[in-house]
Amino acid sequence: MSAGPASDEVAVVIPARNEADRIQATVTAALGLPAAAVVIVVDDGSADGTAAAARSAGAVVTRHARNRGKGAAMETGAEAVRLLDQRERRDRPRHLLFLDADLGPTAAMAGPLTEPVLAGRADMTIAVFATTVKLGGHGLVVGLSGAGIRRATGWQPAQPLNGQRCLTRAAFEAARPLARGWGVETALSIDLLRKGLRVTEVKVELAHRATGTGMRAQLHRAHQLTDVARALATRL
């Protein structure tokens, strides 16, 4: 991994729900990224000890009283970063690195996502996992998202639903309001490309937990499919 020089130009935002078993390792790894000034965890209505585990690992934690979905959690995290930048009287806002809560120790490998943004070569980077795991029922949702992005923009992403992304603050603001729930990644790609912003994929050695094929996993995929379809319906 090319870590790049240490700086404080990036704020890591981690939406999390019921991830008490993995969030501590994810936060610890993210705090070790050379460009990371702070890790913000947004506890999106967890019923377990996610918030306490994240806080004990060194994250700044903000919490939704009820589950509001990934898009809302990303907006809450970005607002927390804005307030921090304002409090520190920064001349320019920090870039935003969004990571999933279940990356665990592999979050330490997210540095390459920040490099094109820090260098001014990209407005948003999207991770492409070098090693993928088979996710139950995932193909349909990925196919829908990828086809929708291609139809809307002419670009075919390798991993359209990958949530590991680094954005400039200006790019994030250009995409607001974010799409609802699990449609946020699909909408981000379409909205930024349509506005002429630079989006690039970056291969990284990250990995997260497979969701399996059980009933709970299938319900999750159904929610994803619904949210992606809703995001596309308003953009095609």
What kind of region is each of these model predictions?
Residues 43-52, 103:
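A conserved acidic beta->alpha catalytic loop
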Residues 51-90:
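Conserved donor nucleotide-binding strand/loop of the catalytic core
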Residues 87-104:
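Short beta-strand-to-loop acidic/aromatic patch adjacent to the donor-nucleotide binding site
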